[in-house]
Amino acid sequence: MIIGVMRQFASQLRGHKVVLFGSRASGRARTLSDFDIGVIGEQPLPIRDFYAIEDSLEDLPTLYRIDWVDLNKAAPSLRQRALDHAEVIHESSVDSG
């Protein structure tokens, strides 16, 4: 489901990676743990695109909470912790289409 949303926004995500981080990525998740999803690139994702993706994630039919974070705008300590055990779930280069 989450990967499907990222595919819908592939052109907006060009040049960015989307990662799963937190307890789901590190293997410490409990049954109802949330999904921490981050986006990172050379530049922050344009705010309009960020919120369009967030709205689509919120519309997913799931009982799980999904936290959507622009890691470019996160505190350096959070960004580093997130990326230490992150799993890339979507990636596209600037020139991919």
PLM feature segments, named:
Residues 1-17, 26-31, 40-97:
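Catalytic core of pol beta-like nucleotidyltransferases
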Residues 21-23:
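Glycine-rich beta-strand-to-loop/alpha-helix junction loops that act as flexible
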Residues 34:
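ATP/adenylate-binding site constellation spanning eukaryotic-like Ser/Thr protein kinases
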